[in-house]
Amino acid sequence: NAVDPTVVPGNIAMTAQRVELANGTAVRADTTGGADAGAITLNVDTLKTQSGPDGRVLISSDSNCGSQCVGGQAGYITLQGIPGFTPPSTRLYRHVTAPDSEPNRAITYYFAREFDLRGTDIHSDAIGNAPGGIVMMRTNGQASLIDSGVSVTTQDFTINDNKPNGQPAQNQGFSRIDIMGRDIVLKDSTIKANAEVSDIGSCPLCQGGPSAGEIWLRAEHSFTADNSLIANTGHGRAQAGITKIIKDHYFSFGAVWDAPYPDAPIDTVKLTNSEVTVEALHEGLPGYLRIRGDTIILDHSVVNSQVNNVTNVLDSQGRLIDVVGAGEAGTVVTDGRSVQGSLLMSAKNLDITGGGIIAPTQGNRIANRIELHADVLTTSPGTRAGGTLAAPRILDVADPSRVVISSSSGSTGGAGMISITGVSGPIPDDVPYPPSSTIRLTGTDVLTDTSSIGLGGRIEMRARGPIELHNTNISANVTDLRPQSVNGQEQSGNIDLSAGNILMEGGGISALTRGTRSGGNVSLSAAQSVTVSDGAAISASSTGLGNAGNITINSGPRFLAQNASITTEANQASGGDIIIQAIDSIRFINGRLSTSVLGGPDTSGGNITLDPAVVTLQNSHVLAQAVQGQGGNITIIAGTFLADPTSVISASSQFGLSGAVNIQS
């Protein structure tokens, strides 16, 4: 321990082919004063730890001088191979200041053979206006953490600030956990990076920082987590951090730029009964979550990227950028960080059973984007709620076993976008990702929901082959306009699906407005066919004063609705239109196609347009209805029109002007 901030505390180094720590052993290089904590370096070929009757194994380099003093930086903890004995491994990376260059920055690692940690806690935590430290683990074999925990913490420290001794903080004051191995295995374990900036603490002018830190989990072959938690959390005005589960970085410093410079994917990532979270709980900037693998399996697990309120403080250049509404119309960057974060998963095969992927906001910051880039995406319901066994998350109250993919807003921030497309190598900025080959969702809820005055979140799915929806609900819900909106023209939650063919069996696709904001539009586009069956429903509706959205279906050669419904409806406002186009045939069997408005004389029902070569109606209804308002029109343009006696086509208004039925055949 050192009280004098000019005194450098002692470091600890162990060098041996085999190191075993057991039964309450502690390796500590802590400080309780203003000096930096010491560094701990274990140069080993094999490291094994095991808790015992006398307690858990502890490796710590903490700075803890309490809330009333100014502390030093938490130290570096390095577990690696033996320099001079272990052959060095040099890797080339791009430097972040020259992203388009060839690999030009060399970093040399010394890899141990194996880490087997059981009942062990490793932490480099700073409490009391101090920057956190770094924990690094390097092995070319397996890094196993069983019933173990790794943590780093930063408290009340400004990014790029100086330490109490006047020296710059290492790593700009960011804390980091960096684990490299051929295989990384977590079981009953935790990986945590935390940061806190208090409103009443010793850092009243910290500009939205520091970050909760960086968690880099880099595995050459596989990453496996079982009943484990990976959490990157910003408290107060601290930013959420960056978490990556990847094979290795594209850049030397782990930058988060994605489309032009994707990181290398792990062969296999599997999360079972686990949770990966990046969250700004209060007023910090959002974080980034990146998981890349050739195969990603989520088995009753939850991936979460949460935000709350904007900071409303100046950035390092004195600009007020992070304010309410920032990030809604496009990317806004402050101090190198976007004011809207993102959750990105990329895989050739993404398989989700139970649990889900969520990006909620409970405050006035817009929710983070969810980007799922997969050649093949498959979901199926589980048997229980997802998350860790000790703290499962119930994402669907009615049925916790369902998969949930959701970006929702419980206050004024607005929902983020959900995009499901294909995986890609480097592509220029602002160029769309290619489509997936197959999207197959079963027992799944895909949802953007804005319960107050925030903007609606868009949902898009694009596939070259099929989009199959089995007992799956896709919904985009909005509520009220904001007072500053002009002529009611603000983003609502639109739903866009495009594929080779689209199949719906049960479930539904819905765009709903509950208030003054207009509802979103629903668009389905297929190169070959659209089939809706088994009680499936496609709807655009309004229960408030905002108009219902439109439904547009371009089905390629064929459209079939069997035991299904396609409707727009408005209780108080005007309804939306329905347009279905097909090259060859549109066929309804025991189906319902309707637009209806239940409001006053100033409302009007939506129009219905069918435009194929052949229209066939079997025990089906095509209705454009109104109560006091004007009924919508029905237009059928077809070379052949066939309707059995039990089918009904009607455009009517009970007390207003009825619409017209126009069949051109």
Language model segments and positions:
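Extracellular and secretory-pathway beta-repeat/beta-biased strand scaffolds
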Residues: 1-665
